[in-house]
């Protein structure tokens, strides 16, 4: 039987090659960048702030916790000598609150724009979805879907605003795999925070699992078209990391296993943020393991320090989405490329949208 023909689209969507973690990046590439982080007052966000401020970035933190945010800014300014670290109160579930955060970040930016947006805000906690209350009640009370509001709707607001502000970043150009991160700090980068719950089921937390699956879906969709705005997008999917979001119950459930380290998440995020050549890639961060790659590409857990083994906490996920494609995706990407080149296809696009809408049942006479 003849081998099937593949239709790779990685070049068409401007996706960079798989991340080679053996190649070092330079944290000094962060100097002069302006970075906006939602949920930046604790956990991963605080780790990002400390690392990036120490390397000369202007960092604007948006968080609902004023006390933690103000305290973090004071500490980081004192530790690093970088006074370009700012806190802005922001409720990511409130549209206008996020708009105000972005506007303030632009105002505080030394060059009047934003280079990287990090959609980091997220919460976990008791999930009432499967607990409707007393079954003999006349009617069920309205459930609290705050986890969805923060972890999904908040991320959608952040992403939408990123696509408004990043292309307006003065001095920035369209994302490019051959850009020189050492020559120009200007960037257009959206970094999404998923989770291991983006990739695997998580019991007792249906809202959290649904939201993080949605963030993965958002990333996989956006990376196929964000080049139209010249924006590069990347995704982090941390395993259970030693932060306050991992509850006591979760720690008990993980007893005997291992938690990942914040510094590994910060390292992966810093690679993405510093290196403007990385486009459309996702990394999973877990506990450090000793592994060896087999001939078929699969990884095998091995004892420490055997021949050809390596210690790593970072893995690439969904690396092959666009190594092959089916007809609809090929056609769509061709359309997007044509749009970027000509900007003159409005009437034709209406026909295409109408045809797709008809096929999906939205438009029927």
Predicted regions and their residues:
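C-terminal helical subdomain
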Residues: 12-15, 20, 235, 252-347, ...
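The beta1-alpha1 cofactor-binding region of Rossmann-like NAD(H)/NADP(H)-dependent oxidoreductases
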Residues: 66-67, 88-103
């Amino acid at each position: 039987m003849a081998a099937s023909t593949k239709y790779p689209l990685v070049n068409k969507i401007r996706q960079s090659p798989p991340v080679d973690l053996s190649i070092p990046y330079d944290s000094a590439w962060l100097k002069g960048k302006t970075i906006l982080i939602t949920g930046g007052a604790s956990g991963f966000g605080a780790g990002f702030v400390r690392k990036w401020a120490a390397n000369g970035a202007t960092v604007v933190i948006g968080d609902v916790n004023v006390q933690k945010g103000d305290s973090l800014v004071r500490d980081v300014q004192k530790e690093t000598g970088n006074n370009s670290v700012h806190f802005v109160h922001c409720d990511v579930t409130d549209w206008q609150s996020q708009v105000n955060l972005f506007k303030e970040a632009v105002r505080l930016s030394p060059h009047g724009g934003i280079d990287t947006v990090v959609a980091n805000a997220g919460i976990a906690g008791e999930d009432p979805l499967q607990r409707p209350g007393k079954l003999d009640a006349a009617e069920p009370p309205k459930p609290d879907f705050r986890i969805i509001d923060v972890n999904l709707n908040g991320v959608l607001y952040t992403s939408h605003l990123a696509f408004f502000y990043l292309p307006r970043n003065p001095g920035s150009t369209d994302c490019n795999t051959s850009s020189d991160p050492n020559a120009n700090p200007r960037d257009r980068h959206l970094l999404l925070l998923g989770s291991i719950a983006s990739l695997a089921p998580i019991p007792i937390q249906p809202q959290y699992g649904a939201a993080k699956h949605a963030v993965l879906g958002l990333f996989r969709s956006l990376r196929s078209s964000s080049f139209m705005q010249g924006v590069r997008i990347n995704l982090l999917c941390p395993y259970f990391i030693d932060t306050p979001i991992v509850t006591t119950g979760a720690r008990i459930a993980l007893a005997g296993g291992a938690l990942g380290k914040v510094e590994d998440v910060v390292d992966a995020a810093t690679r993405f943020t510093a290196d403007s050549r990385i486009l459309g890639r996702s990394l999973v961060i877990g506990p450090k393991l000793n592994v060896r790659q087999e001939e078929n590409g699969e990884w095998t857990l091995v004892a420490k320090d055997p021949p050809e083994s390596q210690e790593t906490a970072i893995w690439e996920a969904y690396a092959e989405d666009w190594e092959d494609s089916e007809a609809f995706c090929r056609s769509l990407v061709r359309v997007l490329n044509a749009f970027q080149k000509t900007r003159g296809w409005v009437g034709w696009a209406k026909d295409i949208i109408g045809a797709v809408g008809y096929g999906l049942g939205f438009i029927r006479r």
